[in-house]
Swiss-Prot record:
Coiled coil: none
GO terms of biological process kind: cell differentiation; protein transport; spermatogenesis
Coarse class of the protein's main subcellular location: membrane
Protein name: Arrestin domain-containing protein 5
Keyword Membrane: yes
Subcellular location: Membrane
Species in which this protein is naturally found: Homo sapiens
Gene transcribed to yield this protein: ARRDC5
Organism ancestry: Eukaryota, Metazoa, Chordata, Craniata, Vertebrata
Tree of life domain: Eukaryota
InterPro entries linked: Arrestin-like_C, Arrestin-like_N, Arrestin_C-like, Arrestin_domain-protein, Ig_E-set
Length: 342
C-alpha cells in the first residue's frame, strides 16, 4: 500500500555555495502513527555561507480524484472531476546557526519529530494517495539553495474494537443447487471456519474451507482471495458530495486438491498479510477514503455455468504506540521505537 521513494537534491549551478544536502533516515522502516522519527541533515558547503536558514519539515497529505458522468438522465452528459484532499501533519524545525554563518565543509544537524497518534496508512492507487515525507532545505538571503525529500512508510492505527460480534463471524456457509447434463441436479456446500477474523499487518490469516460436493462431477478449481474494498469521498466543482467504490485483489491462492464426486474435502489455507496496510474504517470517520477487507472463497463449476462463493469480512487493525509497547513489554521484546519526546 505505498513505496518509499527518494527524490534527488535540487541541481546546483557550477560553483554553488552548497555542494550537497542529504537526509539520513533508517532504510525501509515502517513508522507507526504516534511514534518518533529520528534523523540527520548533512549539509556540505563549497564556501562560507552567511545568514543561512537550514530547516527540516515533516509533511503528510492525502488526495483523491476521479471523473464520472453527469447529466446521464438528460439529453446530454459530460464528465466532471470529483476530488478531495486532507492535510494530516505539517511540522517544521529550523536549526540554530551560531553567529549566523557556516564555514566550508560538512555540517550535521540532528532532528526528531513525533507523528500524530491518529493517521491513515501510506497508500497509493489509481484514485487516491496518502503520503508522508521529510524534506530538508537550505536557504540563502534570497532563495532556496538546495533541498532534499525522502518519503516515509507510515502504518495507521485503528479504533475498531475486537470484541464486537460483527467482527468475529467464525463460521460462514454458502450452498448452491446446480443443474448439469440437462436433467441432473446436485448440491455444492461451502463452509469457511476461522478462529478469529481481526488481524494486524504482517500477521498470518489461517482458515479452513470445507467443500461438500454432492454431484457426479469433480470440482477442480477452488480459489481463495483477499480483497480490499475502498470507498473514496469527494466533491464536484459545484461542491456536491460524491463517492466511488473500487475493489482490488491483494492476495490469491488456488487449491491443488480436486474435490471428487459425492465427497467432502477440507483445505487449510494461510495468507501472510503485507507489513503495511490501510486499517479497516467506517464511512462515518469523515475521512477522504474508507477501507474494508473481505476473504472470498470461490468454487468454480464450469459444467453448470456457475460458481459458488463464501465471504468473510476481515478486520485490519493496528494498536496505538502505547498499546503496542505494553504488549511487546509483556512478551519480553523491546519495542522498535521506545522514545516519545514532545
Amino acid at each position: 500500500m505505498g513505496d518509499r521513494e527518494e527524490c534527488l537534491s535540487t541541481p546546483q549551478p557550477p560553483m554553488s555555495v552548497v555542494k550537497s544536502i542529504e537526509l539520513v533516515l533508517p532504510e525501509d522502516r515502517i513508522y507507526l502513527a504516534g511514534s518518533s522519527i529520528k534523523g540527520q541533515v548533512i549539509l556540505t558547503l563549497n564556501s562560507t555561507l552567511v545568514d543561512p536558514i537550514v530547516k527540516v519539515e515533516l509533511v503528510g497529505r492525502g488526495y483523491v480524484e476521479w471523473s464520472e458522468e453527469a447529466g446521464a438522465s438528460c439529453d446530454y452528459s459530460r464528465n466532471v472531476i470529483c476530488n478531495n484532499k486532507a492535510d494530516y501533519v505539517h511540522k517544521t524545525k529550523t536549526f540554530p546557526v551560531e553567529d549566523n554563518w557556516l564555514s566550508a565543509g560538512s555540517h550535521t544537524f540532528d532532528f526528531h519529530f513525533n507523528l500524530p497518534p491518529r493517521l491513515p496508512s501510506t497508500f497509493t492507487s489509481k484514485f487516491g494517495h496518502v503520503f508522508y515525507f521529510v524534506q530538508a532545505s537550505c536557504m540563502g538571503r534570497e532563495h532556496i539553495l538546495a533541498k532534499k525529500r525522502m518519503y516515509l512508510l507510515v502504518q495507521g492505527t485503528s479504533t475498531f474494537h475486537k470484541e464486537t460480534p460483527f467482527q468475529n463471524p467464525l463460521f460462514v456457509e454458502a450452498e448452491e443447487k446446480v443443474s448439469y447434463n440437462c436433467c441432473r441436479q446436485g448440491t455444492v456446500c461451502l463452509q469457511i471456519q476461522m478462529e478469529r477474523n481481526t488481524f494486524t499487518p504482517g500477521e498470518k490469516v489461517v482458515f479452513t474451507t470445507e467443500i461438500n460436493n454432492q454431484t457426479s462431477k469433480c470440482i477442480k478449481t477452488v480459489v481463495f482471495a483477499l480483497y480490499a474494498h475502498i470507498q473514496y469521498e469527494g466533491f464536484t466543482p459545484s461542491a456536491e458530495r460524491r463517492s466511488r467504490l473500487d475493489s482490488s485483489e491483494l492476495l490469491r491462492q488456488e487449491a491443488n486438491t480436486p474435490v471428487t464426486r459425492f465427497n467432502t474435502t477440507k483445505v487449510v489455507s494461510t495468507f501472510n498479510l503485507p507489513l503495511l496496510l490501510s486499517v479497516s474504517s467506517s464511512t462515518q470517520d469523515g475521512e477522504i477514503m474508507h477501507t474494508r477487507y473481505e476473504l472470498v472463497t470461490t468454487v468454480h463449476l464450469p459444467w453448470s455455468l456457475t460458481s459458488l462463493k463464501a465471504k468473510v469480512p476481515i478486520i485490519i487493525t493496528s494498536a496505538s504506540v502505547d498499546s503496542a509497547i505494553c504488549q511487546l513489554s509483556e512478551d519480553g521484546v523491546l519495542p522498535v521505537n521506545p522514545d516519545h519526546q514532545n
